[in-house]
Amino acid sequence: MDIRNIIKRPIVTEKAVLMKEKSNKYTFVVDKSANKFQIKYAVETLFNVKVKSVHTSNCVGKSLKVGRYAAGYRSDWKKAIVKLGKGQEIQLADKV
């Protein structure tokens, strides 16, 4: 798997920004088939940082109401929380 396809996008929410500021953890949406070793290698290669640990979570898509009677679902996705070593930083556009 290509490392550019492993990390899809960063998650920039209030909780993610607080985790970044307090404990140097960054949150990403990643490919569902990627494992922790692939995620660690992709982050270290793309952002030129040293990763301390990776935690992953499979998030189940929510059910939606589409139209009057039909039901639909959002896609399932995978979230990775990456903790960087001391003094490491990733420049993200999280200041709005």
Curated annotation (Swiss-Prot):
One of its GO terms (cellular component) is ribosome. It comes from the Bacteria. One of its GO terms (molecular function) is rRNA binding. GO terms for biological process: translation. Part of the 50S ribosomal subunit. Contacts protein L29, and trigger factor when it is bound to the ribosome. One of the early assembly proteins it binds 23S rRNA. One of the proteins that surrounds the polypeptide exit tunnel on the outside of the ribosome. Forms the main docking site for trigger factor binding to the ribosome. This is Large ribosomal subunit protein uL23. It comes from Endomicrobium trichonymphae. The gene is rplW.
